[in-house]
């Protein structure tokens, strides 16, 4: 039976440390603040906003919300971002993406108007560059950093280990590979054009699955003693939920097949996702510390 790498334990430890850092900042007259920019009333955005606000309040970080209409113009949204850049009381900004459909073609341009020093969710090119250069140009993406927090909390040493990342997105796969390399792991990144992903995955000491495909990580992809970080959040219409009905979130892994084989695994839900929000708030705290 695999050890469960539970996000709630990681989050509890992170929150305690962050609360102490916030207290130290406030003693110096600095009150960390997160700006949340939302266009419209997307239910998933509202859900994440609620969770992020609650986590921020728990840690002691202020939240200021900027709610714009779904049909907001490109110019109006950029003006809002520039106003946040100019507001010294705001230390970090979370803007929900994807942006409304009429702004899709301009999303990268709009995102890059945010100052990297306030880019706590890694939506600018400069923040992404920081991940690849190892320089503190902005902040790393929250989800892959949450993976690293889990590895650190559970004392999993990456030095000299073979690490395989399934997925090459700029949001998770690529930065996760760079972060693992920074921990002195030897990386392999698999994607949709990779030949024999299962064979490559079986040779990993640390396997990060960020494919975003339900039930894609079967017993054929894993081997004894592996550390499996299941990043993805998928909808499984057949999975029994907390109310006893059908329909619940699940990761890439066929948990019933993979869990008996590997050494440790993050469950979904209850794994990486639960840590990500504390990483976001931690970035706000760090952004505030950088102003001292």
PLM regions and their residue ranges:
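Positively charged, low-complexity intrinsically disordered leader regions
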Residues: 1-30
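Short beta-strand segments enriched in small/hydrophobic residues
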Residues: 31-40
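Glycine-rich phosphate/diphosphate-binding loop of Rossmann-like nucleotide-binding domains
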Residues: 39-54, 135-231, 239, 246-247, ...
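Short beta-strand elements in bilobed, periplasmic/extracellular small-molecule ligand-binding domains
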Residues: 56-70, 187-189
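Short, well-structured alpha-helical segments in soluble
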Residues: 76-88
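Short, high-confidence coil segments that cap the C-terminus of an alpha-helix
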Residues: 89-90, 204
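Anion-binding alpha/beta catalytic cores of soluble intermediary-metabolism enzymes, centered on
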Residues: 92-158, 215
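Rossmann-fold NAD(P)-binding glycine/threonine-rich loop
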Residues: 108-120, 124-129, 232-291
